[in-house]
């Protein structure tokens, strides 16, 4: 089976349209977009549509939508990424669900190729 996957919870409020068409979703967890309310809404819609739930963490950079590498210590970076993932994980858990996957967003997804500390998080 082919997995159809989509980034969601990024402020477009189209999750109810897209979720019935996909198998798994990557939910923005507060770095580049998203907040507790949007994560809750996405988790609820994912559950109704039997969609696997994944975290979509990023640099804490809403101004650039997480698309630019920002100067941040490895400690701050680790803390931010783990906070984002843990936030979504707690919400999913409150509905009896587990995170299926993690898909890095924007600059995090391509800087990991050159920065081993990012990959280790």
Located regions from the model:
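Short, well-ordered coil/turn segments that N-cap beta-strands
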Residues: 2, 23, 49-51, 96-100
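Active-site beta-loop-alpha junctions enriched in small/polar residues
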Residues: 7-11, 30-32, 58-62, 107
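A short alpha/beta connector and helix-capping loop motif
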Residues: 12-36
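Acidic (Asp/Glu)-rich catalytic clusters
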Residues: 17-20, 42-52
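Glycine/small-residue-rich loop that forms an oxyanion/phosphate-binding "nest" at active or ligand-binding sites
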Residues: 63-94
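N-terminal glycine-rich phosphate/adenylate-binding segment common to multiple enzyme folds
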Residues: 90-94, 100-110
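Single conserved hydrophobic/aromatic residue that forms the stacking wall/gate
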Residues: 112-121
């Amino acid at each position: 089976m082919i997995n159809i996957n989509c980034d969601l919870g990024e402020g477009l409020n189209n999750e109810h349209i897209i979720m019935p068409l996909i198998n798994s979703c990557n939910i923005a967890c507060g770095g580049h977009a998203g907040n507790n309310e949007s994560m809750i809404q996405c988790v609820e819609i994912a559950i109704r549509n039997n969609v696997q739930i994944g975290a979509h963490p990023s640099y804490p950079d809403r101004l650039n939508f997480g698309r630019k590498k920002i100067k941040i210590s490895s400690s701050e970076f680790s803390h931010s990424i783990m906070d984002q993932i843990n936030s979504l994980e707690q919400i999913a858990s409150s509905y009896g669900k587990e995170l299926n996957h993690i898909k890095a967003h924007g600059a995090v997804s391509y800087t990991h190729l050159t920065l081993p500390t990012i990959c280790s998080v």
